[in-house]
Amino acid sequence: KSEQSSFSSSSSVRNELSVYHNSRQKPPAEKTNQSSKNIGKKAAPFKKQKRANKGSSGAQVLYAKDSGGAQNESLRSNEADLAKKKNPNPSGDTGSSKNQDSMAAQNVHQKSQMSVETCTTPSKSNLILESLGLQFFGREVTLFRLKNYLTSERHSDVDDNVVQENLNDSRGEIPDSTPESKMHHKLVLPSYTPNVRRTMRTRSKPLEYWRGERIDYQARPSGGFVIGGILSPDTVSSKRKAKGNLGRIITTANRKRICLENAPIKNKFMVNLNIPLGDPLQPTRVKDPETQETVLMDLIRPRDTYQFCVEHDELKVYKTLDTPFFSSGKLIIGPLQEKGKQHVGLDTLVFYVNLGYLLCTLHETPYIVTTGDSFYVPSGNYYNIKNLLNEERVLLFTQIKS
């Protein structure tokens, strides 16, 4: 009896230990529903638990070796444990537990598909990892880096497409008449080089700013600016400008050298007059102030009827009008010639410089007179005129007689 009592006490201790161990594995709702009928059946789950622990350790080893399959298995096991904890009745219908397991497996499968959505195939992900030079430090870090890389590639592709569209638009806007288009040979377009980091910007070589070359910037839809082309204006040949300026200078110089005597006479009248005109070669009828009678006098002297007076070397004096009270005429002085000092007596001489650059001496004071200037010599004084240029010059004079 003593042996039986000791055996029964030892078996009861063992059963209590197994019940305590199983109570920690099951939810709290199952602790109150235990009975002595289940005492003999609790020794087997202890061994199964060891096997499950061994299986979980093996799953961890597989997870270290192969990330894809191990992660899926671990996720499925975790989902199954959560489903068991949520179900308080372990003796429930087997059909509901099967449905829950299938739903958990579907959720795990969907989550795994969403997590690996960025890289479609493992071979592509491995190639991308090798090209980026990344090592496996964890599934989340690797997927995050892959996602950033793929999004950056998409943005770069969009930017390249925008740049290409802008370049195509710039090509279409330029007319065919221009010799150089916006797509200049100085543009450096981005090139794709695998395994080498390159910029995706459109660059340009140094421009000839002195010729007016400028960069044509265009705005992107996403913001910022891109190079749309190079503007190169048409150049005008400098030879034409030089010829045109030279011709203008020559014509103005020739106009200045024209003498008034050789200037052509215009036979066209600006206004048609309907009145009778007198003959310039015939004398004109005028009234004598002393006798109050009408007399004939020569008042007009055409240029072909000038009276020649003096000619000394290149000095010429023409008298155009000669009356008892005054006389008028024209004085022509040759290049670098001098008229000479002369006394006017009791008369008065009035001069007008029609064309020239002269040195005029009035009594004892020299002056420089040019075209358009006038001067006169009073009675009883001397005067002298010298041409300072190497060209013929003309003066008009009037002599007032005393």
Curated annotation (Swiss-Prot):
Presence of keyword GTP-binding: no
Region (Disordered): 1-118
Biased composition range(s): Low complexity: 1-12
Annotated Basic residues bias: 44-53
Cleaved signal peptide residues: none
Biased composition (Polar residues): 88-118
Protein family: Belongs to the CENP-C/MIF2 family.
Protein name (record): Centromere protein C
